[in-house]
Amino acid sequence: MYVIEITYTAPLERVDDALEAHRAFLGQHFEAGVFIAAGPKVPRNGGVIVAAGIERNKLDEILATDPFAQQQLARYDVTEFKATRLAAGLNLPLPA
């Protein structure tokens, strides 16, 4: 499982111009079951994505297709962790 912290490196006006395409990117990967949570940070200087069920190299390939990455609007910091406990109702595979 991964926590992806996105930090904007461009002015919000430029980020906002790419926001619709970024949301479409998120939607595609929610539908594929890779992203399980996402949203803006407070204050709005970036965002956070939680991803699961994918190898790190594949995740890196996916993140490279984000319009924010393609337009060099943000930096991505990826932290992998082993979830050993999940809230009731989250039906995600836990690592062995």
Language-model regions: role of each:
Residues M1-A96:
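Conserved, structured core segments of small domains
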